[in-house]
């Protein structure tokens, strides 16, 4: 009668990054991050891990808004961060009006919720971690990125 649900956990703004960074460090093939905003401060914290992943040959894909969609200093911060991401070998995709906040790791684990992974600063947020290759691949197809990332 009831289907077995994939394993999931909930995090807030205080607990998310510890779990996320642990999953990043265990990545073996690919990390996809969707974050509409990219801020200097958060990038400084995540960049060492992303750089380490890139050196290990792990594909990094970031889907975000184009910097021109941001106002004021946010556009400059996004543009500079995008250049830095590209310099470490990340693929950066742009989606107009983008507002999804999620990450997919090795197509086996994903996070989804309200926290902007590449720009979070000080708001009250929630993120759900789901460990399911079936659901991770389903999410990737649903958001339309499969055609850009291909098989792993």
Predicted region positions:
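A short, polar/proline- and glycine-enriched secondary-structure boundary/capping micro-motif
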Residues: 44, 73-74, 121-125, 148-152
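A conditional alpha-helix N-cap/helix-loop micro-motif detector
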Residues: 12-13, 43, 92
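Primarily the HKD phosphodiesterase
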Residues: 23-86
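Acidic/glycine-enriched edge-of-secondary-structure segments
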Residues: 1-14, 32-38
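Cysteine/selenocysteine-centered motifs that mediate thiol-based redox chemistry or coordinate metal-sulfur cofactors
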Residues: 137-152
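HKD (HxKxxxxD) catalytic microenvironment of the phospholipase D
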Residues: 31, 90-136
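Short acidic active-site motifs
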Residues: 19
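Generic domain-boundary/flexible-linker signal
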Residues: 42, 71-73, 113, 121, ...
